[in-house]
Structure formats: C-alpha cells, structure tokens
Amino acid sequence: MNSPVIPRRAFVARLLGASALGVAGALTVAEDATADDVARAPGDSARGNAVVQWNAIAAEAFAPSEGTNPMAQSRTFAILHAAIHDALNAIVQRYGSYTPGFAAAPQASADAAVAAAAHEVLVRLVPEQAALVEAAYRRLLVTLRDGPAMTAGTAIGRAAARATLSRRAGDRADSAAQPLYAPRPGPGEYQFTAPFDFAAQPGWGRVEPFIIDLREHALDGPQALTSVEYARDLAHVRDIGHAASRTRTPEQSEIAKFWYEDSPLGWNRIASTVVRQRGLDPWEAARAFALVHFAMADGFVAGFAEKYRHRFWRPETAIAAAASDGNPLTEADRAWRPFLTTPPVPDYPSTHTVLGWAA
C-alpha cells in the first residue's frame, strides 16, 4: 500500500543536503572560483536574488495550469534551473555545468543572464503562459542597466537555455502518454478508479532521467497479497482512509489534504523558503534549485517506471475485491470509498513519498 504520511516539515532541515546526495556527482564544485569573483560579477543585489524571482515566476506560470501533469512540471522546473545554473557558471564558474560547451562570458550581467535563460525555457515549455512570462520579463528588463554587460548576459542566458533544451530534446517526454494502459484481470492488478477511465502517463518511466541510472533503482515489488503485512496495511488503509472514517482524526484529515497536492510545486515552495532563509547568493540558489528539481524529476521517472512495471492495484480496488486475494485475513467491502480521489496511476510505489525523499 502507499507509504505512511510523513509531515512535510520533517524534511525541511535536510532539504538541500538530501537532494545533493540523491543526484551525487551533478553540478560539482569548481575549485578555482572565489567569493570575490562572484562579487565582481555584474549584477545588482539590491533588487533581490534573480534566481528566486524567476523561480517564483515559474511557479506562478504553473499555478493556473490545472491540466498540466506534474511529471511535465517537474521536467520543466529541472530544465529551467539547469539553464539558469549553467548561465551563471558561464559568467563565474563555481560549479560544474549540466550542459557544458558554450563560451564563457565573465563580463556579462548575472541578472540579465538569469532572466534570459528563464524566459527562453518558460516560453518554450509553458507556451500557454507566454503572456505572463513576457510581462514579467519586460518588468525585470527595465530594472537592468543597458549596455555591454546586459547584452552579454542576455546572450549567455539564451545560449544556456537553448543548450539545455537541445540536450533534453528527444528524451521521450512527448510520447509518455503512450502506449495506453490496458488493465489485466486478476488479484493485485491495477484497475481504473473512479472517476477516471484511463491511467496517466504510462510511458513516463521511459523518459530519460537527468542524472540517475534507472537500473540502480529497481524495486522488488509490493507485499505479497497473502502476507500478514499486506492484510495489516490493507486494514489500516480501510479504517483510516475511508471517506466516512471514524478513526481518522481531524489532524490526520488535514495532513492528508496538505499532502494531496500531486505536484513539484509544494516542495519548490519549501526549497524557495530555505534558499531565502539561508540567504543563498544566485550561484548557490541556482545549484540548490537545480539539485532539488533534478532529484524530483528523476524521482518521477524512477517511480513511474516501477509503477507500470508492478501494476499494483489501488486500495479501493483491493478492498472491494478482497475476497479474491487469497488472504484469509482480509475483508471485502464493496461500498468502501476513499477520503480523497485516487490519482489515476498504479499504487506501488507512492510517488508522493518518492518526491518527499528526493527533495
């Protein structure tokens, strides 16, 4: 069954460190850069951290897009912050690049580079929000000092964005809705759950990861249907997860609603809070955001690869069909309904939990 609920605040203290471990080897530290190098990079810190600003603009662009799938959001966030990170490190190299190979620009404006990289990625990948992105870009441009530094920054930002987009072209994200999922009969097999008559993004597990090797992340599979552990967990979900549960406390209901958001936006808000509270400079912020979003994007890929490999049924199917699971310790209840609508994907593993640990 799905993993236990873990309060979001428990992860905040280890947010950045856990992400770095999850994508070990990515965006490594360049030893030859100093704080003085960064201080000399053209930019205006009085305006605030441009990386944080563009992260917020990206989140705003996603917010109205109810139809956007969270896996696509995670991919866009990762591409966005890879491009921003690489643009900044072309000006002053403090960390290794995700997509190396374009010319350095030590006299470029850091703020112009961040804005141009973010603008290029968002307009390309979230075209339905192009007006919002263009308006934000124009507002920020008028705060920058015109001249060679701004021109160079704009050029390096666009180059970083295009290099990152080119690297991710052909990563199979565009075909992740195929092939359509066809349920198979039998105990333990995932079936569509109301109100859905489809399974979402069955091919997302074939999308190219940003960092990880999927072969190192295969899981053994869910508990055996006939095991005592399975019967115990099913009974727990049946009691606490029922729409009209008498054992679920008001606090548990609020926690469930809080965690129900099926999107990288929640952890992005936490990352942004940590970045601001720690006072990270643009280079540090760009690396932190990139690592967090690399980890979540790859978590979705690895999680969906396992979901559609194991094709494990959801609790509402399992509870209704418990008489057929071969376990004398389970009890069927065809009238059982979940507290919150079940997402249209197989149960195992829980990608909500995958994202939490990844971030």
Positions of PLM-derived features:
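N-terminal secretory signal peptides and thylakoid transit peptides that target proteins
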Residues: 2-19
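C-terminal segment of N-terminal export signals and the immediately downstream linker at the start
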Residues: 4-5, 25-45
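Acidic/polar surface patches and capping/hinge elements
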Residues: 36-359
